[in-house]
């Protein structure tokens, strides 16, 4: 249990560092690249969310939903301005038939 928590904290730190440093650092989280995650950010933002873009919906087609659902209750989402409820609704908004319920 402790090692799983430590791994999640480490992954969150990597994501934070990648978002803070505007470089060509390649990051892959739950089958989505940093660029793909950024495509979806406007649709899951706490302030002024938008409808998901076509590039966001395309990226979600190959995402690992079980992995993404694992972050739903993560306190790190709030620090990125991500609303977990909006994020959970995103696959349905994109019309993805294989979208799980987190």
Swiss-Prot record:
Keywords associated with the record: Apoplast, Cell junction, Disulfide bond, Endoplasmic reticulum, Lipid transport, Lipid-binding, Metal-binding, Plant defense, Secreted, Signal, Transport, Zinc
Binding positions (Zn(2+)): 36, 62
Superkingdom of this protein's organism: Eukaryota
Disruption outcome: No visible phenotype under normal growth condition, but compromised pathogen-induced glycerol-3-phosphate-(G3P) and azelaic acid- (AA) dependent systemic acquired resistance (SAR).
SUPFAM superfamilies per record: Bifunctional inhibitor/lipid-transfer protein/seed storage 2S albumin
Cysteine pairings via disulfide bonds: 30-67, 40-56, 57-94, 69-102
GO cellular component: a single term: endoplasmic reticulum
Induction description: Induced by glycerol-3-phosphate (G3P).
Annotated residues for binding of a 1-acyl-sn-glycero-3-phosphocholine: 34, 38
InterPro entries: Bifun_inhib/LTP/seed_sf, Bifunc_inhib/LTP/seed_store, DIR1-like, NsLTP-like
Co-factor binding comment: Binds 1 zinc ion per subunit.
Primary localisation category: secreted
GO molecular function, one term: fatty acid binding
Function: Putative lipid transfer protein required for systemic acquired resistance (SAR) long distance signaling. May interact with a lipid-derived molecule to promote long distance signaling associated with SAR. Together with AZI1, required for glycerol-3-phosphate- (G3P) and azelaic acid- (AA) induced systemic acquired resistance (SAR). Component of plant systemic immunity involved in priming defenses in a AA-dependent manner, by modulating production and/or translocation of a mobile signal(s) during SAR. Is able to bind with high affinity monoacylated phospholipids, mainly lysophosphatidylcholines.
Subunit description: Self-interacts and binds to AZI1. Does not interact with PDLP1.
Family stated for the protein in its record: Belongs to the A9/FIL1 family.
Name of the protein this chain belongs to: Putative lipid-transfer protein DIR1
Taxonomic classification: Eukaryota, Viridiplantae, Streptophyta, Embryophyta, Tracheophyta
